[in-house]
Each structure stands twice: as C-alpha cells, then as structure tokens.
C-alpha cells in the first residue's frame, strides 16, 4: 500500500474524500472520529458543515465533482434528509469518475435496497414535501449504493467502531493509491475535465487495474508472504503491454521501499553502451546519494543490505543481461526484496539456485469488453464523425476486436488507422484483414519479433503455419529429420512457444490469426540467410499467393526454391495439367499437398491433376505427400521415401504403393482410403515405424500381406468397407489399439490379431460367432457388432472381458439370448440390443444405457429392472409386443416408449421418488394408444409428484446448479390434467396473477399442452416439438412504465426415429390420436428479477402464455393448454404415496375454464420486453451485494 504522503502529494489542491451523512444523527460521534482518522493520514476531507445553514446545493455538487472518493454513510434517519439523497443522486451520476464506498451504519443493505421498514417510511414522508419529482432518482440512487461493495456495521455486534474506522481508512488509502497510479500511467495529467484527460486515458490499456492486481499477488508485496524475496518474470506477446504494466506497477509501489529502481529498454541500452555499464546504472538508481564508480555490487553490499529493494527491469531480450544485473543477488538483496523482469520470451532456466523461488506472470490478452473499450479510445477519440451511424460503427468495432483477439497494440493501431474514416472504409478493411496486414501492424508488432528468430526457428514458424491446428506429435514429426524422438523439433517448438509465436491447445499447434496472416504473406518470399529462396505456396485464398501459384504452374519446370507446395483443387475451379518432369526440379520440397477444401473427407473432386506420360518424382526431402485422386498405378520408381513421414493418397488409382521395397524408416501415417484398385501392400514392408494405416473402401484388397515385424508399431488399422477382404492374417500386433472391420461383408470369420485392442468394430460383417480366444482381449473397452445379421450367440465366457464398457449388437436379428455370466460384468455401461430377438436381460448392475427398441419378441420386462440404480436411459421404441412396464429405477432420466402399440399398463408408482437435485428427465409414451385409463392416471400422478419433489429439492439445494428444464412427459390423451389450476382452449392462455404470487416458496412452473392433428390429415408425423413463450408484465403505475420479462420454454418433443413399415414394406398411414405434453421448469432468473423489482410491494401482474408446436410436415396444432405455479411444500419431504400432493396455486381459488382470471383471448407482447438473456445479466448484477472491501 502506498504511503499517505505519496497519495496526498499527487493531488494537493483537491478534496480527496467527500463525506455524505445525516448530520443530526452522526456528526458529533462516528463522523467526527472518522474525519479525524482520515486527516491523521494526511487525507484531505470535505464535510458539508454549512448545509444546515442553507448553503446552495450546487456548491456541494461542485465539491463532489472535485473529490476522488465519496463515503456514503447510510444510517437509519438518512432518508429524512433531501440533502443526503440529492448528494447520493449526484454520486451515482459520477459513476466511473468517482469511487463511492458505502458504510451501512446500523441499517441492513437489503433495507436500503428495497426501502423497507422505518427507513422506507421516512423516504415516503420526505417525498410528500418533494415538489421536484425526485423520488424516482432517490430510489435508483439507494438501490445503486446498496449494491456496491461496502462496510456493514451494527453497534450491537462485537465489532468496535474504531476497528471499522481503521478498515475504512485502509480502504481509502488503497483506492487513492490506485488512482494516483492510474494518473501517473496516463501522463500525470490533471483530472479536471477536457480533451487532455481523454487523450491521456486513451494511452492507458483498458483492464490495467486487473493486471496490476494479479501482478501484485504474484510479487507478494502485501499479504502473508510479503517477507519473501521474489523474482517475477513478466512475459507476453509483443505489444501486449508489458512496459505499460511495469511502469504503472513501479509507480504504484515504489514508495513502499526506501531503495527502488526502474530500468527500461535494457536491450537498447546494451546496444548503445555495452553490457558492462548495466550494473553501474542499476546501482545509481538504488543508491542515488552515493558516488558510484564501480561496476560491481561488492563495495556497496553493506549499504544495499540495510533495506529491501524494489527493482523493475524492462526490455530484456538476452539471458546475459539478467546474469549481469542479478549475479549473486543473494549477497546484496535483503530478504523481502522484490525484482520484476519483463522479457520477450519465457526463460526455462533462469537463476537456478536450489532455494531460489521463481514466478512467472503471463500478461493476458484483453477480454472482449476491455478490448472494445481500448479500440474505441482510439477509433472514436473525436466522436463527431460517427454520430449519424453509431450502431453500424459499433457493430464493425466488435468485429475488429474479435479479429485482434484482445491484443492491445493491434487494437490501438487499428483504431488510429480507422479514426474518422467512412463506414465503407471500415467494412473493406475488415474484409481484407484475414488476407493482408497493414504495413504499420506488420512492421511495429510482428516483423520485429520474427527478425529475432534463428533461421531454424523461422523455417519452423513458417512450416507450422502450413499445418496450423494439426496435432502436436504430427507437427513435431514433420519438422524433425532425426528420427522418432523428434528432440530437435521439441526444442524449436518450445522456443517458438516461449516467444508466443505459437501456442498449444488441446494437443494441437495453433497461432494467433495475425501471426498466421503474417506467415501467409511472408511464406512465398521467405529466404535463407544466404539469400536462397525457401518459398511456401499454400494459401490460394490470398490473391497474391494465388497469383504466384498461377505463375509457378505456367513454368515449364518447378522451382528449386519451393519448400512447400499446396494446391487446393476446389479453389482452382479447373483441371490442372503438369508436365511429367514438373516436380523434378523441386529438390528442396518438403511438403507437397494436392487436396480439396470443399470436402473435409476429400471425396473425389470434379477437378483433377493430369500428368501425361510417366511422372518423375526424384524427391528426397519430402516429409508430407498428400495427393487427392493420384492418377497413376503407383508412385514413380525414382521417388525416395527416406524422409517421408505422412503419405496420403485418397481416391487414388494406385494398385500398389511402389514397385519394389523401399526404405521408409520415418513413415508413420499412411492413408489410402477409397483407392478401389489397391491390391498389394508389400511396398510397406520396410515401414517399420508405421502407426496408422487407413485402407477404408479399398474394395480390391483381399488380404494383408504384412508380417508382425512390419506392423509392430501399428496402433490404428481401418479396413472399413474392404468388401474383398475374406480373412485376416494370423498374427499378433502387439501395439494395435483400434481395429475397424465395419462393412467387410465377406469376412465370415474373425480371430484375434492383437491382444492389446481397446476398440473393435465388427459392424456389418458376416461372422456367425465370436472366437473363444476373445477372452484374451482383457483391455477391450468398446465392441461394436451392429447389423451382424448372421451372429447367433456370444461366447459363454464373455464376462472375461472385464473392462468392457460399450457393447453394440443393434440389428443382430438372430441373436436371441445373452450369456447369463454377463451379470458379472461390472464395467458395462452401454448395451444396445435394438432389432434383436432377445427377451431376457441379465442383471448388469453397472448399466447406464439400455436399448431394446424394435424388439418384436419381448412382451414384458423383468421386475428386477428397478434395481438397476445406475440406469439413466431406457429405449423401448416400437416394442410392438410389450404389454406392461414394471416399476422403473429411481435415477432413470429418459424412458422412450414411443410406438409400443400393445402397451396397456404401467406400474404404480411408475418409479420411486427420492429427495434429490435431479437433472432433467423425460418419459415418452407417444402413440401408445392402448394405454388404459389407470395407466394414464399413474403417469399424470407421477408427473405431479415429480414436480412437487423437484420444487422442494430446489429450495434445499442451490438453484444455480439445477438445469432450467427438469421434467417432461407425453402420452395419448385429450384433457389437461385436473391439477393444473389454469386452463384454456386453444394455444393462448392469459391470466391476472395476484400480488406477491412469486414470493416466499415459489420455485417453478408446470406447463401442459394438448396437441392434435389438423383436420383431414392422415399422414403420420415423424417428429414434433412443443414450446411455450411466457410473458409477464407488472402493473405498478408508480414505477413508470410496466416492467416486462419474456422467456421461452420447451414443453416436450419426440422423434419417431425411422418409419414404421407394413409387411409389404410400405409406410403405414394412420390418424394420430391427441397427445398430452407436460413439463416442469424451475423459476428462472427472469422471474427472480421481477421479484427483486417489486419485493415488498403490492403489485398485480398479468401473464400471457402462447404455446406452439413445430413439426416438419405442419400437421399438428395445440388444442388446449394449462399452467400451474409450483411452490415448495412446508411439510418435511416424503416419498411415494405418503407425499404431500398439494401444489399451491397462484391464488386462493384455483380456476379452470371460464374463470375470471383465465382467458383464451389472443394478445401481443410489447416490443420493449426484456428477454431472458438480458434479464440474467441484470439479475447477476443485482445479486452481487458484497459486504466487505
């Protein structure tokens, strides 16, 4: 914390603190003690001594405007004084320019906020004498101050007044210190109004205060660890504001130390004066009264050790600078000293003494909000040019901020360039940014850092730009030429990452959009230190690059200076013909890629590359070779793959990769998908480090002629759709994790070729049974056998697959039973048996998801299903023989029984209710037309109990952790259940809610819609969703315009998941019965906002609900609708039939059709309605009622 003298000296002519208080109540006690304590710290305080004598209020307002901080002391009699209230209104008007700190003296913040009790009564009485219509402003000011972070005090508590005063004084000193720091950062200008201040503010980075706070915590200047010696390294992207931050930080805290020093632009100083002068410069700053004539610390060690030192070093680019300045720092820096260093790159091995504590602070990019403020400081410094089109300019401003991604210097340069330019200029500039940088940004931000890179780092940076967003391991493999360890690439990538040229996200190598654009521009012109070209042609969306590419393609032979050559056939829009020797001269080519950006799967493009005659490709340096629709039978004989890492030839014409065995020690990835003529893989026999092999769609391939020694490193093997494959080699691949044999329709027998498998796909194969040695797959987690129509049974020892989590047997129509031993499988979570003939399910306690849909054999479920406590999802769609459903598991979230045309009864209760903070659950009984009346009553009773149970849970648990929609169900029916208090015919429900309807125990709402087919509609609907728009408007005329909110809720949905066919394969046509949709949703933040707005007042409210149904065929409509307001019960929580079923209504007399407060008339919603997302923000702001600084 800065000393009081340093704070006072910066603004001696102005009042620093203005005291706002009720004089009769506090002047001669608390306020006088507070005033004395503030003045004792040399803080200039203004107290309105002359108010009672009739001084003009305008004079007081001027004093408030001149102050830095206002202390609003809210007491019980505060609202008796118009003076206090008008001063408070003025303080609110100065928000952002004046720091207001409230002290709640013997009054609760909530009482101030809602003007309750005697405090509110006094305000009403004061209003009676108010002829200026100030009441609305007074209330707004009281609400404003109640939401600020302040100090509550109750004289009856144990806390002493003196303790409170000490806290207030400390807070004032801290605030003044920060204000002083901000002024010094912006040029120490006077804080009066005018253009000078706006210019100074624009030079300061938005969000600086937050950065200062974070750096303060890292350096530990205050707090429990302030006695530690700390060296903190401040790093960040070029232009991110390191120097601005360090200067502000130094000015803020230098007065806490008797010995301090700030050295800036150290790298430039070393260039100008040499490294040897650094130590002397630092000593002169630390010991200004000494005659420094030595360049070593030793003669001054005793004097330095008398006090802790505060050192800030900015602009260091070399490790030697730090070693020179901080050598043997333990011998001359007293314990508790703080040293802050700003560097252009992270240091991985700085001052490595064992007991030395080191910290790094990464300067963050600006948030979108701070970035927008920072940009607008420069782009709109003179507002007149943009007054006529503010919204359009602001929209464009946000796009520029998104592009800059919070980079302060880029935002500043963009803002300066755009200032006073036309809107059309802004729009064109925004379009050009991804393709071309302005010279100012390139030279001042990016080129400087790029020039500091070594040649290896420059090459790596531009190469990485070619493979932006690719996997880190993949990029390392491409960059390195020393083998699988890729140690050199690791060092280079780490260096680029430390210099913030790249970053790693989700194991992928990324770079800032600006750096990518810079690399895109620089790549085609890049040169080695000796002047030789190292061009990269890859981004045709850039006009300059496209032009270079066209010129390159017109040459009779390729260029030796090209390092990467990427050709996007989709962008070319035409076939390309290359000479047979076109690529022959590209001796330095490392990355060759002919692809189509139109399709991520690289399906066969319309445009192709033609090469008449034999292709010549004598390239040794190629790491990456991607050639979509490769036109030849094989790669040419002169191709040398000794450095090849990645080979990708999708949809090619090859029959074999190359004619003879070739040494390919670095080849790790091979993708030949949909090369339909491929017959022979013998060319890969020397690819001993191969990890991934994709042969999907290679229909001519009949076998894998590769031995285990050739595939020892293979982790992934994809043979999907290899319809010619009849058998697998009997080998053991010790590294294989994933094997895909999906749609190998001629594969009748499977045997284990790897005991390390994690995932196995056998979908659509002709296998009849699994081999007995399947039990060897002890690591198998996922087994997919969908549509294995010949599969009859599973091995008897299937439970030996102890870690299996997913088993998919969908469509295995001959599979009629499961081994009983599966009950021992404790890891199995997903079991999909749709389309099978299975009638009995083993009791697998770990199951979370069970699918039995389209099972035409099963008629009932085991009663033990209720014991599957982990089961969350049960799919019974189109189980046409299913007659009854037993009691379901307690934690079941989704039951889908759509189309169970024989279903008649359900258990009562449908499921056991337990007190819980349950997440959303859905029970679907659509098109179960044989459900009897009792079953429908059970479903509606379950829904009613579920709503009450959830409402009670919401009161017990934190509502913020409970999803909006909590329960929904649907079933055949034509009536709104009787427990809905409000009902209407049609899709619109309008009612008047009595005052206080949303207070106390109100938790949520239950919604109901009856949906039916439109007249003369015979086609079956495939899917639909039912929604409700809920509009609420208060009628409090005293508050001015009505307060309105609006939000949407999904009432329910269902999908048919395919068409039901008759025996001839035709779609069934039927008239669907009416269906009832019910949902329960929690009290949203919007309603809470309304509650806060009118808390303690008697305010009538009007509700307007409009239901709608959406289906692709537009065949459905809402016939009836209903609403129930749900309240938490007062009784202790009960379960099942003992549960209190009373759902409190919004009024004392529940109303149904024809009641006075429920109507079917249509209406419209006002356009000034506050939508829910805005209301959420408002509620969040209102809820931040902190009580301590």
Swiss-Prot record:
EC numbers: 3.2.2.6
Keywords from the named record: ATP-binding, Hydrolase, Leucine-rich repeat, NAD, Nucleotide-binding, Plant defense, Repeat
Region Disordered, annotated ranges: 1134-1189
GO molecular function: ADP binding; ATP binding; NAD+ nucleosidase activity, cyclic ADP-ribose generating
Transmembrane annotation, as ranges: none
LRR repeats mapped onto the chain: 641-664, 666-685, 698-721, 733-754, 755-777, 779-800, 801-825, 826-849, 850-868
Top-rank lineage group of the source organism: Eukaryota
Start and end residues of each NB-ARC domain: 225-478
Annotated catalysed reactions: NAD(+) + H2O = ADP-D-ribose + nicotinamide + H(+)
SUPFAM superfamilies, A to Z: L domain-like (SSF52058), P-loop containing nucleoside triphosphate hydrolases (SSF52540), Toll/Interleukin receptor TIR domain (SSF52200)
Catalytic residue positions: 87
Keyword Hydrolase found: yes
Biological process, per Gene Ontology: defense response; innate immune response-activating signaling pathway
Domain TIR intervals: 13-176
Keyword ATP-binding tagged: yes
Family affiliation: Belongs to the disease resistance TIR-NB-LRR family.
Listed PANTHER family: ADP-RIBOSYL CYCLASE_CYCLIC ADP-RIBOSE HYDROLASE (PTHR11017:SF489), LEUCINE-RICH REPEAT-CONTAINING PROTEIN (PTHR11017)
Domain topic, free-text comment: The TIR domain mediates NAD(+) hydrolase (NADase) activity. Self-association of TIR domains is required for NADase activity.
Protein name, as recorded: Probable disease resistance protein At4g19530
Record organism: Arabidopsis thaliana
């Amino acid at each position: 914390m800065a000393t009081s003298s340093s704070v006072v000296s910066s603004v001696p002519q102005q009042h620093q603190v203005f005291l706002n208080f009720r004089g009769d109540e506090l002047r001669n006690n608390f306020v006088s003690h507070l005033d004395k304590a503030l003045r004792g710290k040399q803080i200039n305080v203004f107290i309105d001594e002359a108010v009672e004598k009739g001084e003009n209020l305008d004079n007081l307002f001027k004093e408030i405007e001149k102050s830095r901080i206002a202390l609003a002391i809210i007491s019980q009699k505060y609202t008796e004084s118009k003076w206090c209230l008008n001063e408070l209104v003025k303080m609110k008007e100065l928000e952002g320019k004046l720091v207001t700190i409230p002290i709640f003296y013997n009054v609760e913040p909530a009482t101030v906020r809602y003007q309750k009790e005697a405090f509110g009564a006094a305000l009403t009485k004061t209003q009676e004498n108010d002829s200026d219509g100030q009441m609305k402003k007074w209330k707004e000011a009281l609400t404003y101050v109640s939401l600020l972070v302040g100090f509550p005090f109750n004289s009856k508590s144990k806390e002493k007044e003196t303790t409170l005063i000490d806290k207030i004084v400390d807070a004032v000193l801290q605030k003044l210190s920060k204000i002083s720091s901000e002024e010094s950062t912006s040029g120490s200008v006077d804080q009066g109004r005018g253009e000078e201040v706006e210019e100074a503010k624009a030079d300061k980075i938005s969000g600086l205060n937050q950065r200062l706070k974070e750096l303060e915590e890292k350096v530990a200047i205050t707090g429990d660890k302030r006695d530690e010696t700390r060296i903190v390294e401040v790093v960040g992207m070029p232009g991110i504001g390191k120097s601005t931050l360090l200067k502000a930080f130094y000015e803020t805290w230098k007065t806490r130390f008797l010995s301090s020093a700030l050295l800036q632009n150290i790298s430039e100083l070393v260039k100008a004066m040499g490294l040897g002068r650094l130590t002397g410069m630092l000593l002169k700053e630390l010991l200004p009264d000494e005659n420094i004539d030595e360049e070593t610390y030793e003669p001054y060690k005793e004097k330095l050790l008398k006090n802790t030192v505060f050192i800030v070093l900015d602009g260091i680019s070399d490790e030697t600078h730090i070693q020179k300045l901080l050598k043997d720092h333990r011998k001359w820096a007293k314990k508790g000293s703080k040293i802050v260093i700003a560097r252009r790159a992270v240091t991985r091995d700085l001052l490595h003494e064992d007991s030395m504590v080191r910290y790094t602070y990464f300067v963050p990019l600006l948030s979108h909000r701070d970035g927008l403020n920072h940009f607008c400081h420069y782009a709109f410094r003179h507002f007149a040019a943009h007054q006529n089109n503010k919204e359009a300019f602001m929209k464009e401003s946000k796009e520029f901020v998104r592009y800059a991604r919070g980079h302060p210097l880029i935002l500043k340069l963009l803002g300066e360039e755009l200032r006073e330019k036309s809107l059309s200029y802004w729009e064109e500039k925004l379009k050009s940014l991804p393709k071309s940088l302005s010279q100012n940004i390139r030279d001042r931000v990016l080129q400087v850092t790029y020039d500091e890179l070594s040649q290896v780092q420059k090459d790596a940076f531009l190469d990485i730009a070619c493979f932006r967003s690719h996997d880190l391991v993949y990029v390392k493999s491409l960059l390195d030429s020393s083998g699988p360890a890729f140690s050199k690439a690791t060092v280079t990538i780490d260096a680029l990452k430390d210099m913030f040229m790249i970053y790693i996200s989700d194991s992928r190598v990324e770079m800032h959009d600006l750096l990518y654009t810079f690399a895109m521009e620089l790549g085609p012109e890049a040169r080695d230190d000796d002047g030789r070209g190292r061009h990269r042609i890859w981004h045709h969306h850039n006009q300059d690059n496209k032009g270079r590419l066209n010129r390159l393609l017109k040459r009779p032979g390729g260029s030796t200076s090209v390092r990467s050559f990427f050709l996007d056939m989709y962008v070319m829009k035409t076939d390309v013909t290359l000479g047979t020797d076109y690529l022959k001269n590209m001796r330095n080519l490392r990355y060759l890629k002919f692809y189509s950006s139109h399709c991520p799967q690289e399906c066969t493009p319309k445009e192709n590359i033609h090469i008449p005659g034999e292709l010549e490709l004598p390239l040794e340096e190629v790491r990456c070779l991607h050639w979509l629709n490769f036109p030849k039978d094989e790669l040419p004989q002169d191709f040398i793959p000794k450095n090849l890492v990645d080979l990708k030839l999708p949809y090619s014409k090859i029959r074999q990769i190359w004619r003879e065995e070739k040494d390919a020690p670095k080849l790790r990835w091979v993708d030949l998908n949909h090369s339909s003529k491929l017959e022979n893989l013998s060319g890969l026999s020397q690819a001993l480090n191969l990890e991934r092999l994709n042969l999907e769609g290679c229909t001519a391939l009949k076998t894998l002629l590769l031995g285990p020694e050739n595939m020892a490193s293979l982790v992934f093997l994809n043979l999907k759709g290899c319809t010619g494959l009849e058998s697998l080699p009997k080998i053991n691949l010790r590294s294989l994790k994933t094997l895909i044999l999906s749609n190998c329709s001629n594969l009748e027998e499977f045997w284990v070729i790897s005991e390390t498998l994690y995932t196995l796909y056998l979908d659509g194969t002709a296998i009849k049974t699994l081999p007995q040695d399947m039990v060897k797959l002890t690591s198998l987690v996922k087994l997919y056998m969908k549509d294995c129509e010949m599969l009859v049974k599973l091995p008897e020892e299937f439970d030996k697959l102890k870690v299996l989590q997913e088993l998919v047997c969908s469509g295995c129509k001959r599979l009629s039973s499961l081994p009983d031993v599966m009950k021992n499988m404790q890891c199995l979570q997903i079991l999909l048996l749709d389309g099978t003939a299975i009638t009995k399910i083993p009791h697998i306690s770990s199951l979370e998801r069970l699918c039995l849909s389209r099972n035409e054999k099963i008629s009932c479920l085991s009663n033990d299903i209720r014991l599957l406590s982990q089961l969350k999802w049960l799919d019974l769609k189109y189980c046409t023989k299913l007659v009854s459903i037993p009691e379901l598991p307690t934690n079941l979230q989704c039951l889908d029984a759509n189309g169970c045309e024989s279903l008649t009864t359900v258990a009562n209760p449908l499921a056991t209710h337990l007190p819980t903070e349950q997440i959303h659950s859905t029970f679907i009984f659509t098109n179960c037309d044989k459900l009897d009346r009792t079953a429908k009553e059970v479903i509606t009773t379950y829904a009613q109990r579920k709503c009450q149970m959830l409402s009670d849970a919401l009161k017990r648990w934190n509502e913020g952790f409970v999803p909006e929609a909590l329960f929904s169900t649907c079933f055949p029916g034509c009536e709104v259940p009787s427990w809905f208090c409000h009902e209407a015919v049609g899709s619109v429900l309008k009612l008047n809610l009595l005052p206080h309807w949303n207070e106390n125990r109100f938790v949520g709402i239950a919604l109901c819609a009856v949906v039916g087919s439109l007249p003369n509609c015979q086609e079956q609907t495939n899917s639909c969703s039912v929604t409700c728009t809920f509009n609420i408007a208060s009628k409090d005329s005293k508050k001015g315009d009505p307060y309105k909110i609006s939000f949407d809720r999904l009432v329910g949905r269902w999908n048919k998941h395919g068409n039901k066919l008759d025996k001839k394969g035709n779609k069934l046509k039927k008239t669907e019965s009416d269906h009832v949709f019910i949902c329960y949703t929690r009290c949203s933040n919007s309603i809470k906002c309304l509650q806060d707005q009118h808390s303690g007042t008697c305010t009538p409210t009007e509700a307007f609900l409009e239901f709608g149904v959406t289906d692709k065929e537009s065949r459905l409509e809402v016939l009836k609708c209903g609403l129930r307001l749900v309240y938490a019960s007062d009784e202790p929580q009960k379960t099942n039939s003992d549960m209190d079923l009373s759902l409190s209504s919004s009024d004392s007399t529940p109303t149904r059709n024809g009641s006075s407060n429920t109507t079917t008339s249509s209406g419209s919603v006002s356009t000034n309605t506050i939508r829910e997302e805005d209301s959420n923000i408002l509620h969040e702001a209102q809820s931040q009622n902190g009580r301590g600084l």
